[in-house]
Amino acid sequence: MPKEASSPECYTTSTSSNEISEKPGMWRNFKDSFKPPVPIDDIENGSISSTQLKGGQNVPLQQSLKKRQLQMIALGGCVGSGLLVASGAALRNGPASLLIAWFIVSTFLYCTMQCLAELSSTFPVSGSFAVYSIKFIDPSWGTAMGYNYALFWVVVMPLELVASSMTIKFWPSNINTSVWVAVFYVLIIGTNLFGGTRAFGETEFVASVIKLLGIVGFNILAIVLICGGGDQGYIGGKNWHPPFTTGVKGVISVLLTATYSLAGTELVGLTSAEAAGDARKVLPKAIKQVLWRILIFYLLTLTLVGFLVPASDPQLIGGGSGASASPFVIAIREGGIKGLPSVFNVVVLVALLAIANSAVYGFSRTILALAEQGVAPSIFKYVDRQGRPLAGIATSAIVGLLSFVSASKQQEQVFDWLVALSGLSTFFTWGSINAAHIRFRIAMKVQGRSLDELPYKANTGVLGAYYGLIMNVAVLALQFWLAVWPIGGKPDATYFFKQYLAAVLVLAVYVIHKVATRNWKFMVDYKDMDLDSGRSDIDIDILKQELEEEREAYKRQPWYYKFYQFWC
């Protein structure tokens, strides 16, 4: 029989009875929102009456992310500098290198997201995959993965702001780029600090709509330009020659940029603890959108970019004075369409700022989960009445000051360092999601549990998890080879640590945790795994009955409905 999960302490967003009876104004409500949530126990013992409550929840984090917001986060949430800016440097390796690398990464990302859909719909917990690694792999490894993911997001915020300062140079101006960075910095921190989860969700929704409309519009325009609708006349496939400029090593190097551009896709799993509605239905539905984003907004778009911009174009990042330009903007500008490059550059800026906004959310929720697991300072556990992890947001704000490096002449070198560090850490995150899914499935079998009690089963099955894990490990190994023997150069210690610093940090945290806890077991035993705590449905029998009814209803549906439900 499954273990019965203990009930978490309940909280409400109310203030004290005296404060409520006075009907405080906007300023007092604002101040009170930073106070701790009030435990429901205070209601039961009479210190606060139930009529004074505006609403409550079972955990300090607010379940206020709507279905449409989750779907747009999955569909367009991670479209940022990796695709719109860093792809310029990747294109210098040739258009075929660009497309092959993105396709390879996309295949094992899809498998990874299916694993995450199964785990997050079953266990919609704060911290998501960091907690899954602790539960199903090893506490030390899970801790290392948590810090790895927290580091990824805390670095991404200044990275995106640096990218925005590079992009804004498109418009000639006497205004120092640091001024724009300051404006964007205040906007992002203010959104997370004063708007909370609702503001994050709505901001991501609007930004994703703008990004996706911009990319769809670019794709339509690109087809017209390729067919001869621009100043360059008929372009065809001439820019696809040569398809490779740096050989096999070029493809491998682009894998890092491709991973960085797709990193953050897993963020939708991190929202599981704050999703409104039934997590077992909402999350898988949102995660299924990833397939269409990969096909339409990445592979198709990058193919068209390869047709329009030659790999030898000096305007690409690292190629000269036009280092801040997006390859998308270059393509439109070379087409001779006045005004439109500026419009698309606005889309690029929106994308960069939206990712920076996600970075604050991602770091604050990950470090909160680590604190709840007892492996991060307890100050990070503080969540106020609006569901804001204040210490995590404050830490993001402090590290975000690195974005003012945009005033330095070395900003592009900093950009390259941050891209490399962030991109490599993603392989560890994705690989751990696959490993956690594999071990979870094995534990289910060892403990005699049925897969019928899972609210959602991964379309790719456990074989997809094995494929995802193997590919992540393989790419890490190839990146190690490239770090030791770089393209067109000799072995260099500085270059190696620039490319492989994330692996060093993961190993360091893993060893430190092992030594600190003196837990020398390599992995959690299958028979000892906790398969019940954190479940969205405590009564397994009722869940099985509901799932059986849903399966019977599904069988009666026409084939096109089944096709749609499987893929969408």
Curated annotation (Swiss-Prot):
GO cellular component: membrane; plasma membrane
Keywords: Amino-acid transport, Cell membrane, Glycoprotein, Membrane, Transmembrane, Transmembrane helix, Transport
One family name in Pfam for this protein: AA_permease
Biased composition (Polar residues): 9-19
InterPro entries (UniProt xref): AA-permease/SLC12A_dom (IPR004841), APC_YAT (IPR050524)
Membrane-crossing residue ranges in chain numbering: 70-90, 96-116, 151-171, 175-195, 206-226, 250-270, 290-310, 343-363, 389-409, 418-438, 468-488, 493-513
Family of this protein: Belongs to the amino acid-polyamine-organocation (APC) superfamily. YAT (TC 2.A.3.10) family.
Function: Amino-acid permease with rather broad substrate specificity. Transports many amino acids including proline, methionine, leucine, valine, isoleucine, phenylalanine, tryptophan, threonine and tyrosine, but not basic ones (arginine) and citrulline. Functions as a sensor via detection of some amino acids including methionine, leading to a rapid activation of trehalase, a downstream target of PKA.
Protein name: Amino-acid permease GAP6
